[in-house]
Amino acid sequence: MSDLFAKLMDQIEMPLDMRRSSAFSSADIIEVKVHSVSRLWEFHFAFAAVLPIATYRELHDRLIRTFEAADIKVTFDIQAAQVDYSDDLLQAYYQEAFEHAPCNSASFKSSFSKLKVTYEDDKLIIAAPGFVNNDHFRNNHLPNLVKQLEAFGFGTLTIDMVSDQEMTEHLTKNFVSSRQALVKKAVQDNLEAQKSLEAMMPPVEEATPAPKFDYKERAAKRQAGFEKATITPMIEIETEENRIVFEGMVFDVERKTTRTGRHIINFKMTDYTSSFALQKWAKDDEELRKFDMIAKGVWLRVQGNIETNPFTKSLTMNVQQVKEIVHHERKDLMPEGQKRVELHAHTNMSTMDALLTVESLIDTAAKWGHKAVAITDHANVQSFPHGYHRARKAGIKAIFGLEANIVEDKVPISYDPVDMDLHEATYVVFDVETTGLSAMNNDLIQIAASKMFKGNIVEQFDEFIDPGHPLSAFTTELTGITDKHLQGAKPLVTVLKAFQDFCKDSILVAHNASFDVGFMNANYERHDLPKITQPVIDTLEFARNLYPEYKRHGLGPLTKRFQVSLDHHHMANYDAEATGRLLFIFLKDAREKHGIKNLLQLNTDLVAEDSYKKARIKHATIYVQNQVGLKNMFKLVSLSNIKYFEGVPRIPRTVLDAHREGLLLGTACSDGEVFDAVLTKGIDAAVDLAKYYDFIEIMPPAIYQPLVVRELIKDQAGIEQVIRDLIEVGKRAKKPVLATGNVHYLEPEEEIYREIIVRSLGQGAMINRTIGRGEGAQPAPLPKAHFRTTNEMLDEFAFLGKDLAYQVVVENTQDFADRIEEVEVVKGDLYTPYIDKAEETVAELTYQKAFEIYGNPLPDIIDLRIEKELTSILGNGFAVIYLASQMLVNRSNERGYLVGSRGSVGSSFVATMIGITEVNPMPPHYVCPSCQHSEFITDGSVGSGYDLPNKACPKCGTPYQKDGQDIPFETFLGFDGDKVPDIDLNFSGDDQPSAHLDVRDIFGAEYAFRAGTVGTVAEKTAYGFVKGYERDYGKFYRDAEVDRLAAGAAGVKRTTGQHPGGIVVIPNYMDVYDFTPVQYPADDVTASWQTTHFNFHDIDENVLKLDILGHDDPTMIRKLQDLSGIDPITIPADDPGVMALFSGTEVLGVTPEQIGTPTGMLGIPEFGTNFVRGMVNETHPTTFAELLQLSGLSHGTDVWLGNAQDLIKEGIATLKTVIGCRDDIMVYLMHAGLEPKMAFTIMERVRKGLWLKISEEERNGYIDAMRENNVPDWYIESCGKIKYMFPKAHAAAYVLMALRVAYFKVHHPIMYYCAYFSIRAKAFELKTMSGGLDAVKARMEDITIKRKNNEATNVENDLFTTLEIVNEMLERGFKFGKLDLYKSDAIEFQIKGDTLIPPFIALEGLGENVAKQIVKARQEGEFLSKMELRKRGGASSTLVEKMDEMGILGNMPEDNQLSLFDDFF
């Protein structure tokens, strides 16, 4: 027996008689694996033989009990030198295996633990009855059983199962006989009951029919059993089992209907021990109705069988019974008026840290009867808008705050400096070693110092101090100091006095002096000794300011850089001497480089203006007290993100002081300076700091628990003492003390979500900094930070006594809430910028263009429409929005680009007249370009003016122009015309940056900001976090649990960004802080634009937001115009050749078989996708109006599939008559006879998917009105299926652009293909594209096969789209040339007759910068070698090799020397 093993046996008090057995003779511990995060220890033992079963059980039980006392889980396995396979020992251990997880599941244990085992032919044989599922045993249980028996010491085992015929017959016989006995008894009981009943009944003439089986009674009994059944925790289910009952919450639901019409609901539940997948089939309508109770958030009791799902291969419950149950939520049980106010709560806008939404925080506080609740996210206020709206709705006061990162503006190098010559001074360079970082809870164990003059050590001080208790392993490992060093050490007070004498008349010096000085002063104070008053130099800050270019300024890195000896880092005497040597290097450099000679100069002349970047961050909570404070808060957030950002947003103290009006300050958490001072400097220092604040925060002891693990506080009693000290600080500083919860999630069981999110940050994050070193290092546990009720908080602080606890938890928090005024976070009105004479300009431009097109006087229909729109636009202050959009479009037009409109702006005729959109929303009409005569078709018989037959003006004979899409103005600004206009514009991607700068130019840079966005953790990303957490922390979750955890961890703020085209314009008579703070996107301080801090959607009804989006269509049109010289405005919308594309391929000169599709839609915007091409094939559109229908149908949700598609297939409706775009509903219903207001309301309900969500009474009212006006039932039913609809104006703008592109495909094909490949194609494979039709078709077939097998990559999918167009181009007789080193462009394809020459960027792996460099280099001279191409052209060796393989380089030699050699010989 080894000494180590013997010591372990002593610790667990293993009985001596068992230790003396022969198996223990050579016992040893082979290895111990310590899993620090899970606190699991794995022992691997060696024994001479397999232990007797009684000895094994004793060893097992004593190990478990002993380590449980230290909160450590233990497992162990055994390697036995000799193995005894005797039947008795085998049978005993076989049965023992079923007492250990995972073999101890109820079903496995009951079925297999009693079976007989023997050892034959080097195999363990299990005899089982023949009806046992051997396959199930082998697949699901055998591996676990083998593993457990091997852990007992039986070595590598082979196990087999045989059928025991005798057992089978015996069990079968017993089963049959017992069943017969039961049946016989049931029959006998029934006969006796019948006889008794007959004796009681009067005689009857007719025979009574035989009693029927009472199914209802059976169901009732089953239900009663279900109600009383034992609930099984989900975590315990590991194998297939029957009649299991769960209780839990539904978190995912999916309904399906099979092809045969059967209904199934798949759902997932959690009981917070684990989660499970469940499914239920509906056998009849009653079962189907039960599906309605299975919804997200509902708590259910379910019973069913656990089976392995053949598709997912995971355990799934097939539900037999289900019942909704009441889940008892936590409640705040304190009486009204005696409830606390939570003043420190983080929402999911605290980056990668908190889980609860601001809505759930406010709703819960309101539900609990709290009068107010505060929001204090980390360094941001992005939850303010939602919190503001939710609080108003919930009838509770929201207190708006944040937890800020406060730093000192300038961190001094010297404390208490005096006028002294640095080079004539005497220095005491000292260092202390301690048992931890807390001066109040940890002890000094060494003080060492070197007294130095002019760089020489003149005297040294080195004393150990016995703390009165053994040192922890961590302290010994860190410092190298052991208990032996401390034996015989002097008392602390003696050492302190001696050190004070040693330091007289000297400047004190330390590395990170704030710690050492703070520790010394706390100990001086504790022993009534004077604190340090002489000057102190901090060499850490000295180095940071003197050598800002260095990344690390710790003692270790600095001594290495300056070659100063440091043999035993973290022993005070060595550290002190090394610090002293560094000091004189610093003094010399400071004198020579900066002229620093006097101690006073260190702070005045050397401390950098941006030293705040390196300053230690301290947390503080800042609260908005009134409206002035809100604006100051916005300014502080902005400054911290824009001017003072360094790793995190920082607020220098002087900046906070300058903006403190209307704000209240709290001391925050354990990272606040007051809490830190209590720990490290003492109560007196903490009181001085506390005077800066408005109140002192204390938190539940559970929140401070990680400080115990980090050895900053000794134990629970130490935490309670710190809280008492904080209360004492408040008393002395005359500041109220408030108990806050530091909330990060709502419910206790949600702790795991935060754990997953925080641990995903990795060890680089401060919150994950490890405790200990090596394999045993682990991050500190996270505190229990759920939202606590008043009762729970009072329980947390019960150690203070009832009265004091009530004061800090309830009274003081309520008093603070009463000091907070209601503020307006989000404005109630729209504030547009001011443009001089905007109203007059919009009206003037509108009438000017209208007169030009329609004549003066205007037709009544035009005049009335303009008057209606201008009344709304000018009356609601929207003119500036229209004018700004017009100015931007006009500027882009002047640069040669068309601008496409998006959304519903095309519903506004004023927008059309002033040039914002090309879409004309008037009813279809003719208008003469010569005499302005017009004809309008207002009966709804024509869907689009472009579909009117060509016609000449009856007055002057000039061919009419055709226009009008029949779109009501109400779809843009609402029925009353007061909805804030959202004008979205598609600029060319090439011109988008210029358009953005136009906004700055028009409104001023200080008023234009990019629209900010907040990026949150997506569920797929959260899934990855969960899997990573499993891997890193030794967890295993079943699939349903992974899904739950991923859903729970999703939605947390991860980063910020900017809308791709959104720009917010602040009115020039206000400033941005009236609406939102500002910041840089994704904390990129080099970004050229600042963004709104708030998500732009939160303020889009208060300020002007311009959507200046980049789009390929305008770029494509510009390219085609440049190639052809054709003005796209002149392209007709009813070109016959273009319309022919939608019905066949003949117009392209190819057959459908050649290009693989029956129409010519490939590469046409809006219509080129597989989905829309399929729609075209089914509907065969022939008019512009029908194309609008297709556009609407393809962009809507539940508009085509399962709706219009079926109506058209069944001949009930046509493409023309189905509901396609949202506006069609209003127009159709008005033509049918409904009042405009009702028609508008119906349209709004349908387009937003609300038709089935409104009250039945409201919906029936609409249906009755429609039926009264002969609206067909199919139309009404179609309305009920729609979830989302596309605006007709948007469709019209897109279709118009698409037809212009299609025009070039038909009439100028080589130009079309050149533009397509230059602008739209996403992937290229030049070798294939230049290889001819066979190569292209073969590659397409290859990708098609991969697609069928789900093996195609995203790049291959993009390439397939490109190859479809290449194939079409080649089939039409055009050619695809090879890349040419001297002719190819960098970026764009070029036309050479009937051939396209690809650009360099089309070569896989060659980027835009290299492409441009090659073109530039070739202009400077021919490439004489591959080496020169690499050097001057910037091409990598791989790219040059690829070019060579493709024949692009010809016979180019490897280097120039070979060329010279060839020239001479």
Curated annotation (Swiss-Prot):
It catalyses: DNA(n) + a 2'-deoxyribonucleoside 5'-triphosphate = DNA(n+1) + diphosphate. It holds the Pfam family HHH_6. One of its GO terms (biological process) is DNA-templated DNA replication. Residues 427-583 form the Exonuclease domain. InterPro entries: DNA_pol3_alpha_NTPase_dom, DNA_pol3_finger, DNA_PolC-like_N_II, DNA_PolC-type_N_I, DnaE2/DnaE/PolC, DNAPol_HHH, DnaQ, Exonuclease_RNaseT/DNA_pol3. GO terms for molecular function: 3'-5' exonuclease activity; DNA binding; DNA-directed DNA polymerase activity. GO terms for cellular component: cytoplasm. Keywords: Cytoplasm, DNA replication, DNA-directed DNA polymerase, Exonuclease, Hydrolase, Nuclease, Nucleotidyltransferase, Transferase. Its EC number is 2.7.7.7. It is an enzyme of class 2 (transferase). Transmembrane segments: none annotated. It is found in: Cytoplasm. Belongs to the DNA polymerase type-C family. PolC subfamily. Required for replicative DNA synthesis. This DNA polymerase also exhibits 3' to 5' exonuclease activity. This is DNA polymerase III polC-type. The gene is polC.
